[in-house]
């Protein structure tokens, strides 16, 4: 038995903020944003919706998809850099709201790579038999830490949440290999003071290199090649970074997720939101080999090779 995904769910806020809306707020244009980022619109949570709320909505759907009740969950992991407050953790707030009375709970802070860290952590508990069912959530309300006067960052981010229930799956399914990494010397290029601060040029160079290299390495660890890949779900940070990852694996455009056009960069929620979108679109099938890869502040990165199915 391996550790895999047995249920998925996502939540995005109702409010849509388009590039044309941003034109009225700052010195920018739809053409400038689309050309440099690939983003056309993003979702923004209402003032009375916080990270824990979005996490709850996504988690409920993942549990329903898995055909499970909250009391069946042994551990809750929430990847976020925008908790409602420093403590209690979003995971503990989620545990109470779901009624997951048997679950331990903690948050993970690895920025946009957080969901990869969460999935890999969950897999270790499942593989060792310590826990059987684990809820992994990526949720961020980046709008509350975005400087809406800075056109270099304000155009990039959106809000949302994605969740998966992980548990034992059939042999040959689930996570086949993974890589996690960090380079603390790059922390100065992407961080939060009052708002998000980013050295776009340095982050871009790091992301283009690391996304492709990590994807290739997890394939090698699993004894697979680029020809074996059926679908790529990269962190949705910038369409040029996404495209670089696709080219590194030599995949056709129809085999990569590009949800950034509709949602922008949703940080830890990016990969699980994309996973649900592509499943609903019928682009991922049983026994497909999927590569998930992300990077974030820290600097951090993570990649997973996963055989889809239970």
Swiss-Prot record:
InterPro entries: ACP_syn_III_C, ACP_syn_III_N, FabH, Thiolase-like
Domain of life of the native organism: Bacteria
MF GO annotations: 3-oxoacyl-[acyl-carrier-protein] synthase activity; beta-ketoacyl-acyl-carrier-protein synthase III activity
EC number: 2.3.1.180
Annotated segments matching region ACP-binding: 236-240
Biological process terms in GO annotation: fatty acid biosynthetic process
Pfam families, A to Z: ACP_syn_III, ACP_syn_III_C
Keywords: Acyltransferase, Cytoplasm, Fatty acid biosynthesis, Fatty acid metabolism, Lipid biosynthesis, Lipid metabolism, Multifunctional enzyme, Transferase
Entry annotated with the keyword RNA-binding: no
Family per record: Belongs to the thiolase-like superfamily. FabH family.
NCBIfam families: fabH, PRK09352.1
Protein task: Catalyzes the condensation reaction of fatty acid synthesis by the addition to an acyl acceptor of two carbons from malonyl-ACP. Catalyzes the first condensation reaction which initiates fatty acid synthesis and may therefore play a role in governing the total rate of fatty acid production. Possesses both acetoacetyl-ACP synthase and acetyl transacylase activities. Its substrate specificity determines the biosynthesis of branched-chain and/or straight-chain of fatty acids.
UniProt free text on domains: The last Arg residue of the ACP-binding site is essential for the weak association between ACP/AcpP and FabH.
Name of the protein described by the UniProt record: Beta-ketoacyl-[acyl-carrier-protein] synthase III
Organism: Geobacillus kaustophilus (strain HTA426)
């Amino acid at each position: 038995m391996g550790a895999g995904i047995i249920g998925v769910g996502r939540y995005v806020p109702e409010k849509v903020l388009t590039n044309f809306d941003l034109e009225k707020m700052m010195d920018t244009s739809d053409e400038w944003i689309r050309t440099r980022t690939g983003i056309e619109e993003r979702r923004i949570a209402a003032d009375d919706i916080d990270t824990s709320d979005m996490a709850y909505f996504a988690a409920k759907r993942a549990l329903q998809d898995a055909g499970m009740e909250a009391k069946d969950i042994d551990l809750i992991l929430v990847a976020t850099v925008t908790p409602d407050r420093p403590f209690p953790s979003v995971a503990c707030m989620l545990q109470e709201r779901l009624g997951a009375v048997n679950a331990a709970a903690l948050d993970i802070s690895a920025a946009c790579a957080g969901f990869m860290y969460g999935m890999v952590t969950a897999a270790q508990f499942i593989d060792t038999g310590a826990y059987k069912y684990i809820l992994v959530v990526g949720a961020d309300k980046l709008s509350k830490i975005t400087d809406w006067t800075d056109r270099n960052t304000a155009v990039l981010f959106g809000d949302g949440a994605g969740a998966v229930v992980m548990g034992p799956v059939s042999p040959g399914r689930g996570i086949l290999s993974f890589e996690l990494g960090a380079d603390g010397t790059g922390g100065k290029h992407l961080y939060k003071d009052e708002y998000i601060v980013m050295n776009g040029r340095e982050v871009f160079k790091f992301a283009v290199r690391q996304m492709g290299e990590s994807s290739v390495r997890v394939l090698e660890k699993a004894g697979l090649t680029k020809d074996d890949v059926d679908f790529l779900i990269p962190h949705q940070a910038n369409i040029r970074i996404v495209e670089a990852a696709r080219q590194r694996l030599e995949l056709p455009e129809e085999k990569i997720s590009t949800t950034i056009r509709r949602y922008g960069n949703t940080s830890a929620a990016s990969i699980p939101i994309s996973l649900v979108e592509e499943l609903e679109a019928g682009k991922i099938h049983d026994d497909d080999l999927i590569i998930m890869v992300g990077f974030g502040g820290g600097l951090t990165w993570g990649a997973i090779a996963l055989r889809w199915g239970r």
